[in-house]
């Protein structure tokens, strides 16, 4: 995780992640699900790194190492700016925890390169999606 911060003053809010280097990024896209609790998973690439940033709301993000099937879970939120690195040879998925959650994915490959390297799995292959809401 690449940590950021936010500053609030009389003008508004500034969110930033100053330690993120865009040199490997060739494209980006924003995803917003229609409702809280919707799952988009599992999608991976053998040769593409992804960087995940929650612009609005919060999400449970899962990352699976495709060699070992080790699973990692992260909660990303607009209240604590951070960028999650999803390395090549991994699958990822997410479930938004709030209505209106928006996530930006930064990718190291062009769309044409990514299409040649696309790996998909059913959303419940690694079922990490149970959350206790308080």
Task: Please describe what each predicted stretch is.
Residues 1-82, 95, 99-134:
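Non-catalytic, conserved peripheral segments adjacent to functional cores
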Residues 92:
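Glycine-rich nucleotide phosphate-binding loop and flanking beta-alpha elements
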């Amino acid at each position: 995780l690449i940590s950021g911060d936010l500053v609030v003053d009389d003008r508004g809010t500034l969110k930033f992640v100053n330690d993120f280097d865009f040199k490997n990024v060739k494209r980006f896209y924003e995803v917003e699900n229609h409702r809280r609790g919707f799952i988009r998973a599992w999608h991976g690439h053998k040769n593409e790194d992804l960087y995940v940033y929650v612009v609005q709301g919060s999400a449970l993000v899962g990352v699976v190492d495709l060699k070992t099937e080790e699973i990692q879970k992260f909660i990303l939120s607009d209240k604590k700016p951070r960028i999650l690195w999803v390395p090549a040879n991994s699958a990822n998925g997410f479930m938004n925890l709030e209505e209106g959650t928006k996530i930006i994915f930064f990718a190291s490959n062009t769309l044409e390169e990514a299409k040649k390297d696309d790996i998909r799995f059913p959303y419940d292959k690694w079922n990490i999606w149970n959350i206790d809401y308080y």
